[in-house]
């Protein structure tokens, strides 16, 4: 984890790469390198996960694959991009997931072009020894990846004291990525470290009870859950059973 002497590099309350890996493997099935029963929808492929702090600096990176290229290699960068996006567009009292940005950024919609702003920094995401990818020595740790991602898989992380940062996952369909990120955020509250003290804590968001899914209970003040459709802050249905997956409830 990044050294906390510089406030921008403070990863207090956020998981180490080892804790992140253990939590990730607990929410994906054996086909994806994990131990979970059931499926998250999608392809059940090995996953990447990245956590950033509230300034967008990477604190930890992990994979559920046995080697760096067991999962889609490009998804390592995408997971970092998703974490950076979810953090940058979530406030202490209002969360936006990357899934919430899908429809607003399509052609003709109000946020079209957002995905081309704040590009990924290639000097960060492609640096270093590839054999270190997804380990506690991942070369991205301690740096800002940049990038804006506008499909499922990135969610903010909150404690009772406010926003801690965000996590991003990638390696499957974008809808399955959202499901895994949602479950992973919930798991991190019980993974044996301080900080994310309330499972799936989200103080508010664009999803309300009127547009929620029975498989994804909505927090009273709204949350950053995925909504399937083509209007507002909705996301395309990936078509591989992802929308039928039962997800943990959200807490305010």
Residue ranges: model-predicted function:
Residues 2-252:
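Flexible, solvent-exposed loop/hinge segments and secondary-structure transition points
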């Amino acid at each position: 984890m990044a050294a906390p002497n510089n406030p921008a590099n403070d990863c207090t309350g956020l998981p180490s790469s080892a804790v992140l890996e253990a939590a990730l493997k607990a929410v994906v099935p054996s086909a994806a390198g994990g131990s979970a029963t059931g499926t998250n929808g999608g392809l059940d492929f090995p996953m990447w996960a990245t956590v950033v702090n509230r300034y967008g600096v990477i604190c930890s990176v992990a994979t559920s694959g046995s080697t760096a290229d067991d999962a889609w290699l490009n998804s390592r960068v995408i997971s970092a991009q998703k974490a950076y996006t979810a953090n940058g567009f979530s406030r202490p009292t209002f969360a936006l997931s990357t899934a919430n940005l899908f429809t607003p950024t399509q052609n003709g919609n109000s946020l079209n072009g957002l995905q081309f702003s704040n590009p990924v920094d290639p000097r960060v995401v492609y640096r270093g020894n590839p054999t270190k990818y997804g380990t506690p020595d991942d070369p991205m740790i301690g740096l800002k990846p940049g990038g804006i991602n506008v499909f499922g898989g990135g969610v903010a992380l909150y404690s009772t004291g406010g926003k801690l940062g965000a996590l991003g996952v990638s390696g499957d369909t974008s809808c399955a990525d959202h499901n895994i990120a949602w479950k992973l955020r919930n798991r991190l509250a019980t993974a044996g470290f301080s900080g994310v003290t309330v499972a799936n804590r989200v103080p508010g968001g664009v999803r309300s009870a009127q547009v929620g899914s029975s498989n994804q209970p909505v927090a009273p003040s709204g949350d950053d859950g995925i909504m399937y459709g083509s209007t507002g802050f909705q996301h395309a249905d990936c078509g591989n059973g992802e929308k039928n997956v039962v997800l943990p409830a959200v807490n305010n």
